[in-house]
């Protein structure tokens, strides 16, 4: 596989992936994928699908930290079939119980990628049978630990980020990377999956980090910044960067798994997607940002200060931010250059 397509190992001829998928252009000049659109109860590729997948390597670690790899044997492949059979028999009831997502993927800039490139139409399609089985068992146990459900939800999110069909293999360090190593849904020609032991270790670390992470007297409030009424000497903000990252789409990946647990832990919360409330487009972005920063300015003293974390590669967006600050009654007194963590 190259950036140009699939290369034949015999003749070295390259065939674009779009040709293999059977993509076509409709009457409105939109590219339409030729892939089969998965049904709600699907969790695996069908035999006659253009794409399919198979287990082809297993990584082992010895007690002294040594690593080795081998191809799956008959027992491994039989286990895979057994897992698929279990999921096939339970997927509908799991969805009804909220143990596995039943939420459809809504069309959007980022979410269209998995629909177009794989035919996946529901969020659970981004997880294979073994991953669905493991995560459904975790949620089952979480529902019995109501006292710690809040911790469990955060740890679940960490787990689904590290246990999906979008987790790539880092050949340099010989380990798998999480789903969101950048802010996108990148479908892969080969991906990795964790074992129960590896997932438990990650889960345990998440619980420990979360329980130790917040100490002292803190208050966390989920509120529209335009409605904030507290006064403060300093406001520190990390605003969205125009349309650079579609958080309203990406967050639905987690919401699909969290829905039942959120309803049990916080019954007063609204648990559907709030995509419709996302600030999109230059006009709405500027208007909303001015309202937010004007409100913050009105709730700090004359000698107060605001620190704004803002990274963007488009100079026009920086000019837009400067106008927003000025129209909000602020003036820039200092600026620091930083290196961002991703190039997305």
Tell me what each language-model feature is.
Residues 1-233, 244-274, 278, 292, ...:
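Nucleic-acid modification enzymes, centered on SAM-dependent nucleic-acid methyltransferases
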Residues 232-235, 306:
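Generic beta-sheet signal
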Residues 267-333:
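Conserved Class I SAM-dependent methyltransferase catalytic core
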Residues 238:
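Substrate-binding/specificity loop regions of serine endopeptidase catalytic domains
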